Amino acid sequence: MAEVAFLGLGVMGAPMAGHLVKAGHTVTVWNRTRSKAEDWAERHGGSVAATAAAAAADKQFVLACVGNDDDLREVCMGEDGAFAGMARGAVFVDHTTVSAMVTREMYEAAGERQVSFVDAPVSGGQAGAENGVLSIMCGADEGAFQRAEPIMRSYGRTVKRIGESGAGQTAKMVNQIAIAGLLQGLSEALNFCQAAGLDGRAVVEVIKGGAAGSWQMENRHATMLDGAFDHGFAVDWMRKDLGICLATAKELGVSLPNTALIDQYYADVQAMGGGRWDTSSLIERLRRVSAG
């Protein structure tokens, strides 16, 4: 078993760190709001550090799940950042969804300290984190990935190296583009279904086993029909991710017309006060548009 630090105890990070304890690892945690770290340690039995650097000191693996590019830079760099405390040969695993640009920046900064860096964004949402069945897409040197993979298996059902540094983040963009399209299509289908006076649950029971079936249909149709949007990844975070997708697509010269449109639909949801609603709330926008 390994000596591990986990940085960032939000709705994803807290259960992920808990699975590390269950797997038998010794875990030290750090969180910007210290009370969250103390509450986590009381529940799981780990220890709390005052800074990211202190949490990372002498650990074989340092894992992070924070908010965005700036948060990752802050948690890694500076005298209180994780890199300052990490020993040579240690591995930093970043589960945050950030730009490939900042990932490569952190990869280079880690290398200067003879620390390995793995970009490892996750898919599966809060439920996947709580149940330990996340999908984890990784960009890293082969050796760093092989060392970190058993640690990530504590909370990941599918853990795959996609390529070198930045490849994991780029794969996550593919994931988010696909999910955005699926959710808009499902929202339109269910809104149409209800407007036509059909029993939405009965319709889904028939079609979910066919070509239209998806994880989103299986797991979100009922809450979407009921107008309950507190069951997953928040719209605010999806807009952050889609912003990364669109910026990267521009750099690549790739057109993402549907993604750009759905991003604006999510902006409409934010304007409705739904920034913290889950991403299936696109259907609520359609309902309000239909109502005039």
Kindly label every feature range from the protein language model.
Residues 52-115:
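Rossmann-fold NAD(P) dinucleotide-binding segment
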Residues 66, 98-176:
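Rossmann-fold dinucleotide-binding core
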